[in-house]
């Protein structure tokens, strides 16, 4: 069985990353893809389920996992809450041939590249800052102050786009989703992947 690929997806809030991931997984009838579910010490929000949206743990449990080396990456964010990506879960799924997606920011991406040089990273850009702000306002979830803060963070996030392997501009959702699918397909056509997948055939073709 071929090893699955590990992907990083990053984007500023409002760029459509979560919607693209959801649409991608809906197309995955063979169940060959999954999004890593992060651990966090923050309290669940209304509608969030443990093990589905996040693994909700105490600070003590999280710090124990840190000491055990259980995280591929982790960070303590503004507000004092921890977020982390489980290493054993990712390794298990990759070994089963499942492609794993990490929905993380540029700081987490930098940590992971140091530990897993083979990881492929994709950055989702909005068509403009005006459109990004329009989408955030259109959600109807945040105050003007929160939106202003999100826009400030978005500009910081966008400034790291050039650290990624692929860039998708989400000006048209259908086209952006197709671009994402094409990236994943291209990664299955690399020399390394095809050699591993079709070694018997290649040996037969080269046999004298």
From Swiss-Prot:
GO molecular function: ATP binding; guanylate kinase activity
PROSITE patterns: GUANYLATE_KINASE_1, GUANYLATE_KINASE_2
Disulfide bonds listed in the record: none
Top-level taxon in the UniProt lineage: Bacteria
Keyword terms of this UniProt record: ATP-binding, Cytoplasm, Kinase, Nucleotide-binding, Transferase
InterPro entries, per database record: GK/Ca_channel_bsu, Guanylate_kin-like_dom, Guanylate_kinase, Guanylate_kinase_CS, P-loop_NTPase
Catalytic activity, EC: 2.7.4.8
GO cellular component labels: cytosol
Class of enzymatic activity (EC top level): transferase
Binding of ATP, residues: 11-18
Chief location category: cytoplasm
Catalysed reaction equations from the record: GMP + ATP = GDP + ADP
Subcellular location: Cytoplasm
Domain Guanylate kinase-like as annotated: residue spans: 4-185
Annotated family: Belongs to the guanylate kinase family.
HAMAP family the UniProt entry points to: Guanylate_kinase (MF_00328)
Functional note: Essential for recycling GMP and indirectly, cGMP.
Protein's name according to its UniProt entry: Guanylate kinase
């Amino acid at each position: 069985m071929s090893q699955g690929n590990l992907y990083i997806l990053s984007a500023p809030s409002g760029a459509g990353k979560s919607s693209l991931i959801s649409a991608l997984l809906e197309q995955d009838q063979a169940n060959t893809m999954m999004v890593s579910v992060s651990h966090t010490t923050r309290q669940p929000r209304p509608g969030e389920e443990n093990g589905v949206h996040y693994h909700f743990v105490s600070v003590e449990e999280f710090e124990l996992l840190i000491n055990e080396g259980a995280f591929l990456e982790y960070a303590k964010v503004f507000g004092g809450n921890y977020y982390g990506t489980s290493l054993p879960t990712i390794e298990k799924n990759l070994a089963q041939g499942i492609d794993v997606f990490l929905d993380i920011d540029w700081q987490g991406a930098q940590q992971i590249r140091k530990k897993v040089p083979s990881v492929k990273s994709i950055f989702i850009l909005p068509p403009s800052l005006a459109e990004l702000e329009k989408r955030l306002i259109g959600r109807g979830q945040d105050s003007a102050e929160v939106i202003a803060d999100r826009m400030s963070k978005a500009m910081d996030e966008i400034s790291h786009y050039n650290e990624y392997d692929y860039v998708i501009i989400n000006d048209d959702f259908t086209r952006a989703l197709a671009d994402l699918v094409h990236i994943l397909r291209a990664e299955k056509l690399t020399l390394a992947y095809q050699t591993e997948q079709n070694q018997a055939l290649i040996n037969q073709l080269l046999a004298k």
